[in-house]
Amino acid sequence: MSHATGSRAAGATTACKVIVGMSGGVDSSVTALTLLEQGYAVEGLFMKNWDEDDGTEYCTAKEDLADAQAVCDTLGITLHTANFAAEYWDNVFEHFLAEYKAGRTPNPDILCNREIKFKVFLEYAEMLGAEKIATGHYVRQGWRDGHCRLLKGLDANKDQSYFLHAVPEVAIARTLFPVGEMEKSEVRAIAERHGLTTARKKDSTGICFIGERRFSDFLKQYLPAQPGVIETPEGEVIGEHMGLMYYTLGQRQGLGIGGLPNHPDAPWYVAAKDLERNVLIAVQGKHHPLLYTDSLSTEPVEWVAGQPPAPEARLQAKTRYRQQDVACHVRVLEDGGVEARFDEPQRAVTPGQSLVLYDGDICLGGGVIRSTWNHSEPRGDSAA
C-alpha cells in the first residue's frame, strides 16, 4: 500500500516522529519544513484519494506527487505514498452522490477530513510508528479544562476551521498545524527563502475529484439528469432546468432566463427546489425575500469536544466557507441536531451544507443543514 523514498532526518531516533500529509502544495511543504526546524523527526505521506483513469488533464495527482517528492528531497525526509481511493469512495463519494440525488448540496471536503485525513491517514501513520500527524490546514489548537480545542487560523482569510469542524477532539489533539499560526504571505515567503519548488504554486480550489472540469459534466457520469421546468413562486413557467442536482440556492448563472414579457429586466436567482414535482423555483433580484431565512435545523451535530456547551446558547455561526460569523441563538434538539435562529436573516442558506458554530475563535462543531424557514413557513425539507 505504501512505498518509501528518500532518507530520514538526522536525530529521528530520539525525536517525536511526525508524519506530514504532503499534498504537493506550499502549505504542507512549509509544515514539514517548520516541524523539522522545531526538532521533530519528520516524514511525509502523499495520499491518493481518487483513481482517475479517464486520461484527462483534470486530475493533478501525478504532478502533485512529483512536487511533494521534490520538497521531501530538498528537506532530506522520507516520502511514503498510500492509496486511500477505496476508503474515499465508500466513506465520502457515495454519500456525495446520495445527497445530490436527494436534491441537497453536500460538502465532500468536510467528510473527507473526518473520514480520510484525520482517520484513515492517522491510523496509517500510527502503523508507520508516528506519534503525531501534521497537515497544512489553517487552524490552531488550544487547551481549556483539559480538552483540546479547535481554533480558527491566525489568517482570517485562510481559516479552514469550517472544513475541520467534524473532526473529533482525539484526532485534533494528535495533529500539529504549524501554518495555522501564520499568514499565507508568510508561508510563501518561507518557502521562497528555503528554495522549495512549491513556493509559488497556485492553491488548489474546488472539489478535489472534479478539478477544473464543468461540474455538470462530471456529475452526469454518475447520476442521470432529470430535466424539468423553472417556475416563479406564483407557478408561472419561465424556463427549463437540466436537473435539480445542478443548481444550488442563490445561484444566478446558468438559468437561461431572460427577456420575458411582463417581467422587469433583472437577474433571476434560484430560490427553492420542489423535489416532488421536479421544479426549480426562481425569483428576480439578489435580495428577494424568498432568498432569505432566519431559522434552520440540522442533522445531529458533530461536537469537537463530544458534547454541546449547553442546551441553549448564544453563539456565532457560518453556513458556508468564508462567510463572516453571524450571531444566533442555538437550541439542542432531542435527536442531537440543533435549531438556530439568526439575529439577521441569512441569504441562500442551503440544505446539505453545514452550519458550523463558534464561541469566539473556538470552533465548537457543526451539523448538516436539514431544513430552513423564515418566520413560520418551513421550506427546507421538501423545497431544499
Curated annotation (Swiss-Prot):
Transmembrane stretches in the record are none
Could you provide one GO biological process annotation from this protein's UniProt record?
A: tRNA wobble position uridine thiolation
Q: Where is this site: Interaction with tRNA?
A: H137, Q353
Where ATP is bound, by residue? G21, M22, S23, G24, G25, V26, D27, S28, M47, G136
Q: Where is this region: Interaction with target base in tRNA?
A: 107-109
Protein EC:
2.8.1.13
Catalytic activity entry: S-sulfanyl-L-cysteinyl-[protein] + uridine(34) in tRNA + AH2 + ATP = 2-thiouridine(34) in tRNA + L-cysteinyl-[protein] + A + AMP + diphosphate + H(+)
The subcellular location is:
Cytoplasm
Region annotation Interaction with tRNA: where it falls in the sequence:
158-160, 320-321
The record ties this protein, via InterPro entries, to:
MnmA-like, MnmA-like_C, MnmA-like_central, MnmA-like_central_sf, Rossmann-like_a/b/a_fold
Which cysteine pairs are covalently linked by disulfides here? C112-C208
What domain of life does the native source organism fall in?
Bacteria
The UniProt entry annotates the active site at C112, C208
Quick one: where is this thing mainly located? cytoplasm
Q: What does this protein do?
A: Catalyzes the 2-thiolation of uridine at the wobble position (U34) of tRNA, leading to the formation of s(2)U34.
Q: Which enzyme class, named as a word?
A: transferase
Task: Tell me the keywords, alphabetical order.
Answer: ATP-binding, Cytoplasm, Disulfide bond, Nucleotide-binding, RNA-binding, Transferase, tRNA processing, tRNA-binding
Name used for this protein in its record: tRNA-specific 2-thiouridylase MnmA
Q: What species does this protein belong to?
A: Chromohalobacter salexigens (strain ATCC BAA-138 / DSM 3043 / CIP 106854 / NCIMB 13768 / 1H11)
Return the SUPFAM superfamilies for the record.
Adenine nucleotide alpha hydrolases-like
Q: Name one GO cellular component term.
A: cytoplasm
Under Gene Ontology molecular function, one entry of this record is: tRNA-uridine 2-sulfurtransferase activity
**What family is this?**
Belongs to the MnmA/TRMU family.
Xref: NCBIfam families: PRK00143.1 (NF001138), trmU (TIGR00420)
List where this protein forms a coiled coil: none
